Amino acid sequence: MAVPKRKKSRSTTRHRRAQWKTTPTQLVEIRVEGKVLRVPRNLVKAYHSGLIDVED
């Protein structure tokens, strides 16, 4: 693991950490059992194969 050569100030550390941002999940429209759903792209196969039930 990397070892820092110099101490980082609390301000610098917090400024760096504050830059991390989340991105919203990309939703795609699919049709399952006659219903149009907006689901995450990585779950499309699971919905089509029936691994995830479609709730009303």
Curated annotation (Swiss-Prot):
Q: Which family does it belong to?
A: Belongs to the bacterial ribosomal protein bL32 family.
Query: Is Ribonucleoprotein a UniProt keyword of this protein?
Result: yes
GO terms under biological process: translation
Primary gene name:
rpmF
The upper taxonomy is: Bacteria, Bacillati, Actinomycetota, Actinomycetes, Propionibacteriales
NCBIfam families according to UniProt: rpmF_bact
State the signal peptide span.
none
Is-annotated flag, keyword Ribosomal protein?
Answer: yes
- According to the record, the residues making up region (Disordered) are 1-22
Which molecular function terms from Gene Ontology are attached? structural constituent of ribosome
Mark out the compositionally biased spans (Basic residues): 1-19
Q: Which top-rank group of organisms is this from?
A: Bacteria
The record's section on InterPro entries has: Ribosomal_bL32, Ribosomal_zn-bd
One GO cellular component assignment for this chain's record is: large ribosomal subunit
> This protein is called what?
Large ribosomal subunit protein bL32
Instruction: For this UniProt record, give its keywords in alphabetical order, as a comma-separated list.
Output: Ribonucleoprotein, Ribosomal protein
